[in-house]
């Protein structure tokens, strides 16, 4: 592909398209099911991790899906409002999706639509992570291992931790503020979404880049996703099945 989407082009497209669809009569005609799922997801995230977490993770997910939505409008691809997926789990949600109808006009359009979601999510996930880490505390790791849950760190989160907290001594760890946990979840879901699998953003991007050869990458990616779902977080087994 000769052209690549950039942060600047994303913002430029956002300004023009937002003005266009805000002026249409159907802009505020959000289907009831989308509203109910949004409320249900806010409730499950609030119940699992509190108000600060719920607000921040919903903002990140909404920004991610609106990135796709805005690019769909730019390329005149019919797209639904986001469907949030409530789930009483570790995160309180399985994320959110939008439905696209009709033919995507070009590989450039597919690439831009696919990559705009992660860009939109990161715009909010990064400052939320930094603020959350600033509010977090370094404490001794509890002797009772059953009361302690250690989290893996996405590369960006690890860099932000060192920047905001510094090196943590042995026997200590960062006890994440709920806002920091929302940032961690946002970075984690963004990384997961960029896996080159079918209907995930990474699947769209890899197809736009290499076309039919992406089938090989897809098979490897779906295998890795199933292993992740089985051994790390069983809540994604249903999603893995739907991606087949």
What are these regions (language model features)?
Residues 1-244:
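Hydrophobic transmembrane alpha-helices and their immediate loop junctions
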